[in-house]
Amino acid sequence: MDKRSIMKYERSQKLFEASQEVIPGGVNSPVRAFSSVGMNPPFIKRGKGAYIYDEDGNKYIDYVGSWGPLILGHCHPEVVENLKAVLETGTSFGAPTEIELKIAELITGAIPSVEMIRMVNSGTEATMTALRLARGYTGRNKIVKFNGNYHGHSDGLLIKAGSGALTHGVPNSPGVTPDVAKNTITAKYNDIEGIMEIFKQQGEEIAAVIIEPIAGNMGVVPMTNKFAHALRKITEDYGALLIFDEVMTGFRVSFGGAQSLYQIKPDLTCFGKIIGGGLPVGAFGGKREIMEHLSPVGPVYQAGTLSGNPLAMTAGYTTLSILHNNSGIYEELEKKAQKLEKGFKKIVKELQIDASFNRVGSMLCMFFTKEKVSDLETASTSNTEIYSQYFRAMLSRGVYLAPTQFETMFISDAHGDVEINRTIEAAYEGLKEIRNNPSI
């Protein structure tokens, strides 16, 4: 039986119309506008566990999870309790606090490559400052990034990017000057020969290579193990730094991040999302020798009014402590994600729908293409019109997915069998509806 909900969006529609008068596009991050899936966005009022609720009272199983931070689900009781306690003592001081030390010790203890860490306010700040540090440390100017990898919206990294830049067809943003762009070299993801040729030609000028070890902003696209180790070797050979952007994967795919899966130690690592427990945060860290080039002990400048603020540090420390003290969480996340992937695969096989799947731990993406997705080119073969219809079919059945083909499904500790089973059921109903549509 079709369990499609009767959704009402009157209040969300009014709020969106009003927002468009005072906020560009009505949203504070482009993907939230839902333009790529052909509808206006519901305005979310609250979340609890695996669910979110919009302003019209509609209830959804949430697989966005605030774009990754909420690995424990919405409003985890311990996180909420600790945040309430901090609110009674002060929200920000612009001065050192003990909680900054505690989370720094926890992160450096979990990630062997990170001997020192600096807190900032966003993933964009983390990657931007990590590159400044790499340039200051090496005395070189050029950086290498990979097509389809998204590292935030700083000028030098908005070149052939993923995430919203890919969704909205703006791989090279206006406003990025030629002088900035000339120091950014782009390369094909998972292409060993390509990166070797770049270093052969310009290796002595390259300060760093920055990469998402598991690209989560063109779906879910992991590095091959061979490519990962080739990157580590060639950067070492040429004296360039290897920077892992683990804003999405850090503490998500394992407690040691993606680098623990590949058994590689990058020189610098960028973090965000989970380490803030749902509050704004970013961080970058690495070898002591490199990190001590940062001010106030070194010449490379970085600062932030709200960096390390007690609220974000408390939410992050609480979240990381729960993950650290409950090692079985990652095994359970793997089982849940595996069950979901298996259910999806069975559906597309039965309905004869072209789809391929990539999954690492609790990050999952179903691409509507026959191709095995390994880079931007293969990701771009996905049928975005089918995804758009799939998204709307799922939303109408109470399942909230990313409003773009080129993002990730995040499974949280709060998702249980009830939610997983309902999601699989909704996917079958929705995809069957799409399959029976003669226009597809």
Swiss-Prot record:
Its EC number is 5.4.3.8. Disulfide bonds: none annotated. SUPFAM superfamilies: PLP-dependent transferases. InterPro entries: 4pyrrol_synth_GluAld_NH2Trfase, Aminotrans_3, Aminotrans_3_PPA_site, PyrdxlP-dep_Trfase, PyrdxlP-dep_Trfase_major, PyrdxlP-dep_Trfase_small. GO terms for cellular component: cytoplasm. Its main location: cytoplasm. It catalyses: (S)-4-amino-5-oxopentanoate = 5-aminolevulinate. Its cofactor is pyridoxal 5'-phosphate. Pathway: Porphyrin-containing compound metabolism; protoporphyrin-IX biosynthesis; 5-aminolevulinate from L-glutamyl-tRNA(Glu): step 2/2. Keywords: Cytoplasm, Isomerase, Porphyrin biosynthesis, Pyridoxal phosphate. The modification N6-(pyridoxal phosphate)lysine is found at residue 273. GO terms for biological process: protoporphyrinogen IX biosynthetic process. One of its GO terms (molecular function) is glutamate-1-semialdehyde 2,1-aminomutase activity. It is found in: Cytoplasm. Belongs to the class-III pyridoxal-phosphate-dependent aminotransferase family. HemL subfamily. Homodimer. This is Glutamate-1-semialdehyde 2,1-aminomutase. The gene is hemL.
